[in-house]
């Protein structure tokens, strides 16, 4: 016959020994080799933000205000033509995003449009761009527990958010991406574009870890978004 009081003492002692481990798993973000923060996993935004200026107080220049007035989500949203979202809008898409860390790069694979964003850790921006792109050229480096990302080289086709905030080819986006805790990722943006805005402005997005999730196939055809299974 088992000694139940002794069993209870052993189980209780084991539980106490596990408390610091469990707390560490929750409070301290994981690291990869070389003590670089581990951002990998499938993430999804915690709160959808259609507009980065919901109160309508964006610091437009006259050019920026005129471009914003022309924006119509039902007519000329670039995404209606199945074009890439651009940055920062890609980071505000309300669909899962998977992050991979490989030598020299951080890769972000967004289910929306099945778009791949590359953040280069092993080079600088070119002195001149052969062509300007939707998502620009992203260069990253680690500063403590944050990934600092500098992105330039944009074309002027995309919107900054889902309601039509415009930008020019002078757009410069700076991000500080940090894993706040095991289940939370935070991205702080600074937006600079002297043609569209009278001053730099900031935005923030929070993401939550989605264990067990996978990125699904996404089809954009004839201006209609079709989602396939998760």
Residues covered by each model-derived region:
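PEST-like low-complexity, intrinsically disordered acidic/proline/serine-rich tracts
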Residues: 2-3, 21-230
């Amino acid at each position: 016959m088992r000694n139940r009081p002794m069993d209870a003492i052993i189980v209780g002692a084991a539980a106490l020994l596990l408390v610091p481990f469990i707390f560490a798993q929750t409070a301290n973000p994981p690291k990869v080799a070389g003590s670089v923060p581990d951002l990998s996993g499938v993430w999804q935004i915690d709160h959808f933000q259609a507009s980065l200026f919901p109160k309508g107080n964006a610091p437009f220049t006259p050019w920026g205000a005129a471009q914003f007035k022309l924006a119509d989500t039902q007519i000329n949203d670039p995404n209606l033509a199945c074009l890439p979202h651009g940055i920062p809008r890609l980071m505000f898409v309300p669909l899962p995003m998977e992050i991979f860390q490989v030598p020299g790069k951080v890769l972000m694979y967004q289910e929306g449009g099945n778009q791949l964003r590359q953040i280069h850790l092993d080079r600088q921006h070119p002195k001149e761009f052969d062509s300007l792109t939707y998502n620009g050229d992203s260069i990253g480096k680690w500063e403590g527990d944050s990934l600092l990302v500098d992105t330039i080289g944009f074309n002027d086709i995309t919107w900054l958010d889902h309601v039509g905030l415009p930008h020019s080819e002078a757009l410069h986006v700076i991000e500080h991406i940090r894993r706040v805790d095991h289940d939370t990722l935070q991205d702080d943006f600074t937006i600079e574009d002297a043609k569209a805005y009278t001053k730099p402005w900031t935005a923030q997005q929070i993401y939550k870890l989605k264990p067990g999730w996978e990125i699904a196939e996404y089809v954009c055809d004839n201006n209609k978004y079709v989602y396939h299974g998760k």
